[in-house]
Every structure is written in structure tokens, then in C-alpha cells.
Regions:
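Core nucleotide-handling region used for phosphoryl-transfer chemistry
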Residues: 2-475
Length: 475
């Protein structure tokens, strides 16, 4: 059990942010919200993003691939906050939530789902792409993604092109007749973007929050739709709308935006229709199951085995080394770094050491992770004492304060792990190793690698130092 009480729901968090804002020197609600999450150790499992043109709005979202063991104490809030835009200035509880995305579909096999079929379950075709959220606040339309408040600053697969640029390309294909050749070739891109999005939102209802899937040939995750949709394919799929006041889903079976070229997923009458369509198409990403228990709508995703395998083994990031690191951190016995390279990265260019020999990726990553483990463990031992009988620790604050923030963050997380996991002993090196691999994302590892690669004083061997320097360059 944890040694402190988590907030019970989203509104408890909002109320604490408001109370804290009255005494805080910070004027940014996003900063205050993040501090509240850190207070309850809900960050970085839950993330905050600020709106640069509106201090009243904040985006609160979960880290969808975070270790579920670390969110047990606030699992309901974690699940509810897939992506929520909050108005921190409103006095009305009913108006706090500006936009709210449904929970991330839980991956299940058709065999497991078959054990729990209910007659009220609904089935919808799934698309492989990026979620785009569109909503109106204070007479201004906002375009974002589930983890970024501005679609123009969001990207994933493509190394340079943003989802905002891809969205504009889709809209230009839909509304090209509204532009002259002169406008397209000589007008400022921002002016064209504003006109495109104004035309698009003229077809939308301000009282609704919309969810679309951006399907684009330069934003492939798992499926290449070229043979189905044509070379250079790009489209928007309208998958959901919510009432801005009640936050209830709106029925879109009448396909209200199909007249302007927006695509809609197929809805299936039953599980057999959904399954048969999935297995009969080589381009099927699967289907979504919506269940309606007493606790609210829950989504599940069922896909062909080939899609499930790729999603479990290929992170699909543009940087191959991010994928290699991710595979290592999953620590699967049946799928290793060598397997990833043999299947997905046969053309990888391996680093060369000072003797002109290629460096094995598994060796590089394992040496780096082991070094991080040694550094964090030694600093933890130096700064922390723990009494297993009382489940309390003492921290050497003077020594701890001398370390860089990134080190102090991980030491604090280890102390939380020491308490919350109810160890009957002081943390061991293998516990720290598991923490690094299971409780961190690629960004956290990159920050540690960069710190060790650019700073001395951590008693790192020459061999390990070479590996860390190489990985700092490729990550």
C-alpha cells in the first residue's frame, strides 16, 4: 500500500490547482498542475502541456505506454485522462472540461474477448493513424492531438513534417476548389492554413468536440494503405463527437461530414461481421469494441495477429535506435534486439569503434543500462537510509541537493518505489535495473545518457564511457 492518499478524481486535482494558484508566484496553470501531479507522484505517468496563447487552458494526458503497476493508486484518474483539455479559470464545474477523449482501447485477443461478449457491445472499424482533436473554446477553434495542444507542433513518424502540415494537405485536397492557382503558389502558408481551417470549421458545430484519425502516407505506423487508397493517400476519418456540455458521445451514424469528403468507419451489426471483415482484408487494422459497464464507456481493440505482433515488437519511431532501446527495455525473452534488427532494420548502419570494428547494439545498450543502474544505485545508497520495520526512509538532503535535477528526480522515484512496493529490504541493484527498464520512457533514458556523456565525476569505466558517448550521439 502507498503511504499517502491520492486525489479521488479529476475535480480534486483541479480544486487543488486553484487553491495553489492563489498563493503561487507562478501565473501558469500548467506549471501549478504539474507541481500538484509531482506532489502525488502522478507525474510523469500523467503529463501536462500548456497552451502558449491561452493561460487558462491546459492539456492533461496520460502516458499511454506507462507501466500499469505504477498507476495502481490512481488507476481511474489515469484511465480517465487519456486527453483532457481543462479551463482552469471557469467557476462552473460543468465547464471545466473543454474537450475529452475516450480511454485508449485496451488490446485484447479475439479468444479473450469471446469470453466476455455482451449484447450491448458495439463494433467499429479501426484505422491506423494519429488522433486529431477539434473543438471550439471562447469562439476560437483549436486543433490538437491527444498529447499536444497544437497540431502544428505535433509529429511522430516523419522526422520534419508536423501533423498540422499533413492536416493542411488533407484539407487542401478537400477544399482545393476554394483556392486559385495564384493563392496556392504565392500566398503565405499561414494564410492558406487559416483559410483551410476556417472553411473546415464552418461545417462543424461549436457545441461539439470532434475526434478524427489522420491517415496519411507520410504518417504510417503499422499499415501502408497505398494499395487500398492509392499512392500519396491522405484522409480524415471522423470517429467520434462529444457534446461539450454533457460530455456524452453523439451518434454520428448519419455521417454528418461525409458531404465534404470526410471518411467514416464501418459499423458492424455483430462480432461475426466485424471479425469476418477483419480477416478478409489484408489492409485491416482490426476493429474497436465499445462496452458500456456501469463505470462508463470502455474501449477494446482486436486486430489480426500480424498487426498485434508488429505493435508489440516495433515502436515505429523514425530513429531506429529509439526502437532498439525500447525493445531492450521490454526485456522479452522471445523478442530481442537481434530479432528487431533481422525483421525491421536490416539496413542499420552500426557504429564503429576506435579499432574500426562494428559495435554490437545489444552490447552497447546493455552496457549503458547497466551503467545507469550502477550510478543510480550508488547515489541512492549514499543519500538514503531505510527502516523496513516502519517503511520509512531518511534522505541526506545536503548531499542530494548537490546532484543535477535529472539525478534527483530518479532518486526520488526510487525512494517512492522503496516505500510503495513495501520492500522488506533496502533496494538492490536488480531492483534499480528493473526500475530503469520498466518505469521509464525513452526520453528519461536519453536525459540520463546525455548527462553522463557530457559530465564527469560518476566513476564510469572507460568501456562504459565509450558506449554512453556512442549512444548519446545516435539517440
Amino acid at each position: 500500500m502507498n503511504t499517502f492518499n491520492y486525489p479521488q478524481n479529476l475535480y480534486d486535482i483541479v480544486n487543488e490547482v486553484r487553491l495553489s494558484s492563489q498563493d503561487s508566484i507562478s501565473t501558469h496553470y500548467a506549471t501549478i498542475l504539474q507541481n500538484v501531479l509531482k506532489k502525488y507522484h502522478m507525474w510523469p505517468a500523467m503529463q501536462v502541456k500548456k497552451f502558449y496563447n491561452n493561460n487558462s487552458l491546459v492539456l492533461l494526458h496520460n502516458s499511454y505506454n506507462y507501466n500499469q503497476d505504477d498507476v495502481v493508486g490512481f488507476k481511474q484518474i489515469f484511465d480517465d485522462c487519456r486527453s483532457i483539455v481543462l479551463d482552469m479559470n471557469t467557476d462552473s464545474k460543468e465547464k471545466v472540461v473543454v474537450s475529452y477523449a475516450n480511454n485508449i482501447p485496451t488490446r485484447v485477443s479475439i479468444q479473450d474477448y469471446a469470453k466476455n461478449i455482451h449484447e450491448t457491445d458495439k463494433y467499429q472499424q479501426a484505422f491506423d493513424g494519429t488522433m486529431i482533436t477539434v473543438y471550439n473554446y471562447d469562439d476560437t477553434w483549436y486543433f490538437g492531438t491527444t498529447s499536444c495542444p497544437d497540431v502544428n507542433h505535433s509529429s511522430f513518424y516523419h522526422p520534419t513534417k508536423t501533423h498540422g502540415e499533413m492536416l493542411n494537405e488533407v484539407l487542401m485536397r478537400l477544399f482545393a476548389n476554394n483556392f486559385t492557382d495564384e493563392e496556392i503558389h504565392y500566398h503565405d502558408k499561414k494564410d492558406i492554413e487559416n483559410k483551410l481551417r476556417t472553411i473546415f470549421t464552418s461545417h462543424l458545430d461549436k457545441q461539439c468536440a470532434y475526434e478524427f484519425v489522420l491517415v496519411h502516407h507520410e504518417n504510417k505506423h503499422i499499415i501502408d494503405y497505398s494499395n487500398l487508397l492509392g499512392e500519396g493517400y491522405m484522409t480524415l476519418c471522423h470517429i467520434n463527437s462529444k457534446d461539450r456540455v454533457t460530455l456524452e458521445d453523439i451518434n454520428i451514424h448519419n455521417q454528418p461530414l461525409s458531404s465534404i469528403g470526410i471518411v467514416y468507419p464501418m459499423n458492424y451489426a455483430n462480432i461475426n461481421d466485424a471479425y469476418n471483415d477483419m480477416v478478409s482484408s489484408e489492409f485491416s487494422y482490426g476493429f474497436i469494441v465499445a462496452k458500456y459497464p456501469d463505470t462508463g464507456k470502455k474501449l477494446f481493440k482486436i486486430s489480426p495477429d500480424s498487426i498485434t505482433f508488429k505493435e508489440e515488437t516495433d515502436p515505429c519511431k523514425p530513429n531506429i535506435w529509439h526502437n532498439i532501446l525500447s525493445v531492450y527495455m521490454k526485456n522479452r525473452k522471445d523478442f530481442t534486439i537481434k530479432d528487431y534488427i533481422n525483421i525491421y532494420a536490416t539496413d542499420i548502419v552500426l557504429p564503429i569503434d576506435e579499432q574500426g570494428r562494428t559495435m554490437d547494439p545489444t552490447y552497447l545498450v546493455h552496457t549503458m543500462i547497466s551503467t545507469l543502474k550502477d550510478v543510480l544505485y550508488n547515489l541512492y545508497v549514499a543519500t538514503t537510509t531505510y527502516n523496513p520495520k516502519t517503511n520509512r526512509f531518511k534522505m541526506n538532503k545536503e548531499l542530494d541537493s548537490q546532484f543535477p535535477p535529472v539525478i534527483r528526480f530518479h532518486l526520488a522515484q526510487l525512494r517512492l518505489k522503496q516505500q510503495s512496493d513495501q520492500y522488506q529490504h533496502f533496494l538492490r541493484p536488480k531492483d534499480v535495473y528493473q526500475y530503469i527498464c520498466k518505469n521509464n520512457n525513452i526520453k528519461n533514458i536519453k536525459l540520463l545518457v546525455n548527462l553522463l556523456a557530457t559530465n564527469g565525476g560518476y566513476n564510469i569505466s572507460e568501456r562504459a564511457s565509450v558506449c554512453i558517448t556512442v549512444l548519446n550521439n545516435v539517440l
